Amino acid sequence: MKKQIFDYYAMSIADQFNITLEEMFTQTKTSHIVDARQLLYWLCIERPIKKSYIKTFCQNNGYDVSYSTLRHGYKSAKILIGSDPDFKAMVTSIQENDN
């Protein structure tokens, strides 16, 4: 159940950022890919999906993420969503269609 929600969030965000899932789950610091991953963390934690599940789902996609990175990404995404109405609209739309 949580895996399907995670997959929906990941696909939706990748689509919005015009990147592939492979790009989203690569070890890169490119800003738009980092933003995409951080928004994924924010959506999952707000759902709520346990951090241990998020970590496992990311690992299943080839991306090793630490708990501190999840926390930092969540906080960064929260600031981004609070300051940019376009990101706020995007995550709201994704959340409204996640069932």
List the model feature ranges, each with a label.
Residues 1-11:
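General nucleic-acid-binding
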Residues 10, 19, 39-40, 55, ...:
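Conserved catalytic core of nucleotide polymerization and phosphodiester-bond processing enzymes
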Residues 11-37, 65:
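Short, Lys/Arg-enriched anionic-surface-contact patches
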Residues 33-49:
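Short, amphipathic alpha-helical "recognition" segments used to contact nucleic acids or chromatin
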Residues 45, 74, 78-81:
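DNA major-groove recognition helix of helix-turn-helix
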Residues 50-52, 56-72:
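Short, basic interhelical loop/turn and adjoining N-cap
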Residues 80-99:
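Short Lys/Arg-enriched helix C-cap and helix-to-coil transition segments
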